[in-house]
């Protein structure tokens, strides 16, 4: 064979070998693509737990024969064991009642003396701890509708001022949340449907508002709109910060019942907010109250109002992570804390986390058939939920 012919033949074989390699690589690539498209990353399903019958966890905070007791909020003092609770003698409207626990919610005092004006409260009271720029600590208590009024205490709740208006504006569930901003200010969140913001008594669109305090909660600015929605009725916003402190989220009730609950985020200390979007069914309900557990998870107490939920109207809790909120995931656990015998009337805050990691969550509900609602606390630890989930 001629040498030149041999070189041509060798080159021809090389071309064939290269084509085989290319074809093989192409087949492998196609197989990889098909394999990826046919498989999804494993996502653990939401686990439903039920503590309703675990009566050893339950403590009656207050109950009165024939009397509606509702809508409590709580605050944990710095000693890690004193919890204060306020709640109305009636459905939102009614005299503000006040109790104290000095042992982390295991036992509660008798009803404590309150200022005369607290008997005139028109709406659900809320209580918060604040600190002014000088470092002095205060307790502030709000009572809503028109006008929003406030009382404060300078001695850890031993004595209180009368209720006085904070401005010429009103609102509903004032204040649903209080956020300590990085500059030392406080941002209070409430909502209105047009009736009380200017006392016009004319229902219109729902708006979530904020008011700011520069002096530790003693005085407040005029309200500004945080978010609204063209179709949904957003209200009762529960605030929580990201673990790194850079982002604030508001978890909101949707009052028209046409949507799931909503969430919005701010990365500039509440100056601007993302477009509100729906949350998963597992977080759909009313009056979300969130606290971080000692292991970094989120515990959110709320009234279950998810469509077709077997626990609709009951007191439930959601356990998950901040990332679950951001990514719209279902979370780790959904826990029925107590069966409400009414279709919907139950479950406002609060949620406190003790130094040993115990969660003390307190709310009202129709806990007995044909009886008005009363106030109950439940104590639990996230590790106990983990153990319960493993036994399923």
What are these regions (language model features)?
Residues 1, 32-35:
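Gram-negative host-targeted secretion-system effectors, predominantly Type III and Type IV
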Residues 2-5, 17:
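Intrinsic-disorder-associated, low-complexity terminal segments enriched in Asp/Asn/His/Tyr and depleted
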Residues 12-25:
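Bacterial N-terminal signal peptides that target proteins for export
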Residues 24-33:
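Bacterial N-terminal signal peptides
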Residues 36-392:
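Asp-box/BNR beta-propeller blade signature and adjacent active/binding-site loops
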């Amino acid at each position: 064979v001629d040498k030149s012919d041999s070189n041509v033949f060798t080159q021809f074989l090389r071309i064939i070998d290269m084509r085989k390699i290319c074809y093989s690589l192409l087949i492998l690539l196609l197989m990889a693509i098909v394999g990826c498209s046919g498989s999804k990353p494993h996502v653990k399903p939401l686990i439903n737990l039920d503590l309703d019958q675990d009566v050893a966890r339950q403590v009656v905070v207050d109950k009165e024969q024939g009397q509606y007791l509702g809508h409590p909020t709580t605050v944990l003092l710095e000693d890690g064991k004193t919890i204060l609770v306020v709640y109305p003698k009636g459905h939102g409207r009614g005299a503000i009642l006040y109790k104290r626990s000095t042992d982390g919610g295991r036992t509660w005092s008798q009803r404590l003396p309150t200022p005369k004006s607290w008997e005139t409260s028109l709406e659900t009271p809320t209580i918060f701890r604040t600190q002014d720029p000088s470092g002095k600590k205060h307790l502030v208590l709000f009572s809503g509708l028109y006008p929003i009024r406030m009382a404060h205490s300078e001695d850890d709740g031993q004595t209180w001022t009368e209720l006085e208006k904070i401005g010429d504006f009103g609102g509903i569930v004032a204040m649903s949340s209080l956020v300590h901003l990085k500059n030392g200010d406080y941002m209070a969140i409430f909502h209105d449907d047009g009736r009380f913001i200017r006392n016009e008594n004319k229902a219109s669109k729902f708006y979530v508002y904020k008011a700011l305090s520069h002096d530790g909660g003693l005085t407040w600015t005029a309200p500004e709109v945080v978010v609204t929605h063209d179709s949904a009725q957003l209200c009762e916003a529960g605030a929580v910060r990201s673990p790194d402190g850079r982002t604030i989220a508001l978890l909101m009730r949707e009052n028209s019942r046409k949507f799931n609950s909503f969430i919005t985020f701010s990365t500039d200390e509440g100056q601007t907010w993302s477009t509100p979007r729906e949350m998963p069914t597992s977080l759909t309900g009313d009056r979300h109250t969130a606290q971080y557990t000692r292991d970094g998870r989120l515990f959110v107490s709320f009234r279950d109002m998810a469509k077709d939920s077997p626990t609709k109207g009951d007191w439930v809790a959601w356990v998950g992570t901040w990332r679950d909120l951001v990514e719209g995931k279902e979370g780790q656990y959904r826990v029925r804390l107590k069966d409400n015998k009414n279709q919907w009337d139950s479950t406002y805050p609060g949620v406190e986390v003790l130094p040993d990691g115990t969660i003390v969550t307190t709310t009202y509900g129709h806990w007995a058939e044909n009886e008005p609602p009363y106030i109950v606390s439940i104590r639990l630890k996230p590790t106990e939920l983990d153990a319960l989930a493993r036994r399923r």
